[in-house]
Design a protein with these regions (language model features):
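Bacterial N-terminal signal peptides that target proteins for export
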Residues: 1-6
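Bacterial N-terminal signal peptides
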Residues: 7-14
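Sec/Tat signal peptide C-region and signal peptidase I cleavage site
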Residues: 15-21
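Sequence context surrounding c-type heme c attachment/ligation sites in exported
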Residues: 21-151
Length: 151
């Protein structure tokens, strides 16, 4: 009976760890997609001239981006490295866990950049500067910590 209880406990603990890993991966993938779709996409298109400038819409996108970025830091716990063959277009590089302080600093820098950009998108030129700054932050992290799995 004792061995059975230990075996069941070990199985449940293992299943819980796998579920937690999967949950973190799914949450961060969903948030990253939402950051583009609901956050920076409209301001980015406006800055490129692909959409008419709308200050309220630009600010709403930046606010959404800030909301999403605030949720990101805890979504890379030690047990949430991506599987060997992820079924998503992009995944997190294992370099994140090799250099967690740098990764966390990049997230903090993005948070700061978003906060500093608020209210600066008063016209297209201001929005272009905001998008340029945010893009540099995003690229700085994605170049090092994002893996493209399939095209």
């Amino acid at each position: 009976m004792y061995r059975t209880t230990l075996a069941v406990t070990a199985i449940v603990a293992g299943m819980t760890a796998v579920a937690a890993q999967s949950d973190a991966i799914q949450k961060r993938n969903a948030l990253m997609k939402s950051m583009w779709k609901d956050g920076i996409s409209a301001p980015y298109r406006m800055a490129q001239g692909k959409e008419p400038f709308d200050q309220a819409k630009a600010e709403a996108g930046l606010a959404k981006m800030a909301e999403i970025v605030a949720q990101l830091p805890p979504l890379w716990p030690p047990n949430s490295k991506p599987p060997a063959n992820p079924d998503t277009k992009y995944s997190s590089s294992t370099k994140i866990w090799d250099n967690k302080p740098d990764f966390e600093a990049k997230l903090a820098n993005l948070t700061k950049s978003i906060a500093e950009s608020r209210g600066k998108a008063k016209d297209v030129d201001g929005l272009k500067e905001v998008v340029r700054s945010l893009n540099q932050n995003c690229e700085g992290c994605h170049e090092r910590y994002q893996v493209t799995n399939r095209k």
